[in-house]
Regions:
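Substrate-binding/gating loop at the entrance of the active-site cleft, primarily
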Residues: 17-21, 25-28, 38-56
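Short, intrinsically disordered, charge-balanced linker/junction segments flanking boundaries
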Residues: 1-6, 79, 106, 168-174
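Phosphate-binding glycine-rich loop
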Residues: 1-36
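Active-site phosphate-binding strand-loop segment of PLP-dependent enzymes
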Residues: 59, 63-131
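Hydrophobic residues at beta-strand termini and immediately following loops
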Residues: 16, 61, 150
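Conserved core segment of the aminotransferase class I/II
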Residues: 140-174
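A short helix->loop->beta-strand "cap" motif at the edges of active sites that frequently abuts
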Residues: 35, 56, 114-118, 143-145
């Protein structure tokens, strides 16, 4: 409701022991040995290390300050994504604190649909660093068919150590 996204709590939300559990389970569910995973650079190291642990190849995509830490879509479009299964994004972004704009989410959804891959937005800082409108990638038209969003109450509700999170996606992904 905070993000204006309609989800069926019986089949489109998965409670988690923190969002890191969601990172693990999502990667295990979608990535096989030899696949590729697009990871933001800079970005959360777990996306890369977990991909390597599973025998997948992490492929960095650049986030630069001159672009407001948003993906360079020309660079993404030029990539061979035939072996890519997941694209990780993390907005509000850590370590920079940058927020995604609606256009970034729209372009990520379009990219995922055309390339037949899944975008995972790791969104645990949404209520800490998101001044103004709270954005969810799942609020974008068509996103529920190709996107997953993780969130964590531990950070947003000042509950460190409680490990309370959730995964939101279409019922098939959940």
């Amino acid at each position: 409701r905070w993000f204006g996204v309609q989800l069926d709590p019986t089949c489109e939300i998965q409670p988690l022991i923190g969002s890191k559990e969601g990172i693990l389970h999502t990667t295990l569910a979608f990535v096989d040995h030899g696949d590729q995973v697009l990871v933001p650079d800079p970005g959360y190291p777990t996306y890369t290390s977990l991909s390597r642990l599973l025998g997948a190849q992490p492929v960095p995509y650049n986030l630069r300050p001159e672009r407001g830490w948003q993906p360079d879509f020309d660079e993404l479009e030029a990539m061979d994504t035939s072996r890519v299964r997941l694209l990780w994004c993390n907005y509000p972004h850590m370590p920079t604190g940058a927020r995604a704009c609606r256009e970034t989410y729209e372009r990520l959804v379009d990219f995922a649909q055309r390339r037949n891959l899944v975008v995972v937005n790791d969104n645990p800082y949404s209520f800490i660093l998101n001044e103004g409108e709270h954005l969810s990638i799942l609020a974008i038209d068509g996103a529920k068919e190709c996107c997953i969003e993780l969130n964590s109450m531990s950070k947003s509700h000042n509950m460190p150590g409680w490990r309370v999170g959730m995964l939101a996606a279409n019922a098939e992904f959940v």
